[in-house]
């Protein structure tokens, strides 16, 4: 029996997804005073999103969710945990 978690239970930082990959937000570890901005833009636990691309130097990260594209700093994307689809 393998001890590797199945893909459906694996949780990874948003910034670790490859461009074109999708995931479901499971946790947002951004401090409360910054988290409100993301919540207002629709990034909630349970939201399905797609990592669109990284800027040429890797920062920012462009994400598609709820019908629009959102750019996040890489350090913010590292604090959003997703379950890859």
Range-by-range predicted roles:
Residues 19-75:
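Amphipathic, hydrophobic secondary-structure cores in small proteins
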Residues 1-17, 76-81, 85:
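Extended boundary segments
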